[in-house]
C-alpha cells in the first residue's frame, strides 16, 4: 500500500472507513468513486470538527489533501 499523509486508523470509525474507501478508489483510479467518497469526507470531517476530534485547520488541510489526490 502507498504511503499517505493521513492514516485512517488515527481517526474515529466512520471517518476511518471513508478515508480507507477513498484511498482504495484512488489506487484503483476510480474517479467516480473518489468523488463519491470525497462528499462523505466533506460531511464527516465537518462532524469530526464539531465533535472536537479535529480542528477547522485540520479539516481544511485534509480536504485540500484529498482534493489534491482527486485532481492528480
Regions found by a protein language model. Name each.
Residues 1-72:
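Acidic, Ser/Pro/Thr-rich low-complexity regulatory regions
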